[in-house]
């Protein structure tokens, strides 16, 4: 009986491997089911086009925003979501993690990581080719006739909330709030979404579920893709403060430390150090400029984007070789000097961007900051984040803790 938990864990991991193998085998076959489509004329049109989605051999630009939770990735995602010629997806890898990784393991084991990364790369490759049917393997319950209401944060994608993918009677073309999209649009038709994807020149995907750029090498080197990686980093002290505020239960011991002034003996330090280790490993690879990343990698500090959003956005689009859309410029103008009361939603993007980047300095005690600086000193120096040497320095907004650095893209 003492080994029963090991047996359960082994069975769970075996089940994951079997699921993933089955998905790989099944998805090698056609997803196309013309008879199941009910829209007038749509089945015939798709049947004439062929039974499968072909690989896109044009030079579509495929953008991946590589980030971690609470690093400003939703904000960066909007810089692409607002572009009229970009098909943007918000965290599609959520479905992979939710389906393949048992909740009780939280995806921390090496075996979980290998399964997750293999499945994630396969899904990303398919999504960049506008094959949204592949996503159905990870949606529970499975879509019926390629329609579902279970796509994670569907409302965060403008295209999925606009005509022709969404066509609610009597509604205007503009749906402002994510919740409005979900309520007014009804079921998501993945066939229509795939058509909308193919009509656009570029595909952008945001993820916080790939630890580092090395994990993407197979996709970067895939000749069928034109993948460019925007790695978004943020001061780990700021990430810790934001997560403690947003995920109050998960980070309750950090909050307890802040409230009592005493460090809990059972504090999960990996909630901080994992971020620093992943940043350091990934950024080290990027800054070494290996040949496989030439023209494919750009490092962006959230703080630089927050201080000068228009300038940094122009640099990002120049690196990608995509013309900057006027809708993007307008969105930046309207959403980076916003009323702070409008940015309280934990995934909101309306904010005073410069103030938001510095807010962590008033949400952490100096003891916690000193601990974080000691644990993450290498990556702080690597990314140009200065140490706060006293409580007074930490709380003084006139003293910048961000060095001037010019992280140029590897061209």
Curated annotation (Swiss-Prot):
Give GO MF terms, alphabetically. Answer: keratan sulfotransferase activity; N-acetylglucosamine 6-O-sulfotransferase activity; sulfotransferase activity
Mind telling me which Gene3D superfamilies this protein's record contains?
P-loop containing nucleotide triphosphate hydrolases (3.40.50.300)
Q: Which residues form the signal peptide?
A: none
Q: Which key words tag this protein in UniProt?
A: Carbohydrate metabolism, Glycoprotein, Golgi apparatus, Inflammatory response, Membrane, Signal-anchor, Transferase, Transmembrane, Transmembrane helix
Pathway in which this enzyme or protein is active: Glycan metabolism
Q: Return the motif ranges for Cell attachment site.
A: 337-339
Query: Which Cys-Cys disulphide bridges does the record give?
Result: none
Record keywords: Methyltransferase included?
A: no
Q: Supply one GO CC term from the record.
A: Golgi membrane
Q: Where does the record place it? A: Golgi apparatus membrane
**Where is 3'-phosphoadenylyl sulfate annotated to bind?**
69-75, 234-242
- Asked if Phosphoprotein is a keyword of the record, the answer is no
Q: Which family does the record claim for this protein? A: Belongs to the sulfotransferase 1 family. Gal/GlcNAc/GalNAc subfamily.
**What is the protein named?**
Carbohydrate sulfotransferase 1
Taxonomy, top ranks, is: Eukaryota, Metazoa, Chordata, Craniata, Vertebrata
């Amino acid at each position: 009986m003492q080994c029963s938990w090991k047996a359960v864990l082994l069975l769970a991991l075996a089940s994951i491997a079997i699921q993933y193998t089955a998905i790989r085998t099944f998805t090698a076959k056609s997803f196309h089911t013309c008879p199941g489509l009910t829209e007038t004329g749509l089945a015939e049109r798709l049947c004439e086009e062929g039974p499968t989605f072909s690989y896109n051999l044009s030079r579509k630009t495929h953008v991946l925003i590589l980030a971690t939770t609470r690093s400003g990735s939703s904000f960066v995602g909007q810089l692409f979501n607002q572009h009229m010629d970009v098909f943007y997806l918000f965290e599609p890898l959520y479905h992979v993690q939710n389906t393949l990784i048992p909740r009780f393991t939280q995806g921390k084991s090496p075996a979980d990581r290998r399964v997750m990364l293999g499945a994630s790369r396969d899904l990303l490759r398919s999504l960049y080719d506008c094959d949204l049917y592949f996503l159905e393997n990870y949606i529970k319950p499975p879509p019926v006739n390629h329609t579902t209401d279970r796509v994670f944060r569907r409302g965060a994608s403008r295209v999925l909330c606009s005509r022709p993918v969404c066509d609610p009677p009597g509604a205007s073309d503009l749906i402002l709030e994510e919740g409005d999209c979900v309520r007014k649009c009804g079921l998501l038709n993945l066939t229509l979404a795939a058509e909308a994807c193919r009509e656009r020149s570029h595909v952008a995907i945001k993820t916080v579920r790939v630890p580092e750029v090395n994990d993407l090498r197979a996709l970067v080197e895939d000749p069928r893709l034109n993948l460019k990686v925007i790695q978004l980093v943020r001061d780990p002290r700021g990430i810790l403060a934001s997560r403690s505020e947003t995920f109050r239960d998960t980070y309750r011991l950090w909050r307890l430390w802040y409230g009592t002034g005493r460090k809990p003996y059972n504090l999960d330090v990996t909630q901080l150090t994992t971020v620093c280790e992943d940043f350091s490993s990934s950024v080290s690879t990027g800054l070494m400029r290996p040949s496989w990343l030439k023209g494919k990698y750009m490092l962006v500090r959230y703080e630089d984007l927050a201080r000068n959003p228009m300038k940094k956005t122009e640099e990002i689009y120049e690196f990608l070789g995509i013309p900057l859309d006027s809708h993007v410029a307008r969105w930046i103008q309207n959403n980076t000097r916003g009323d702070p009361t409008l940015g309280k939603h934990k995934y909101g993007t309306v904010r005073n961007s410069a103030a938001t980047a510095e807010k962590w300095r008033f949400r952490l005690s100096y003891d916690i900051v000193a601990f974080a600086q000691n644990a993450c000193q290498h990556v702080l120096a690597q990314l140009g984040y200065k140490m706060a040497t006293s409580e007074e320095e930490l709380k003084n907004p006139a003293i910048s803790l961000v060095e001037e650095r010019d992280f140029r893209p590897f061209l």
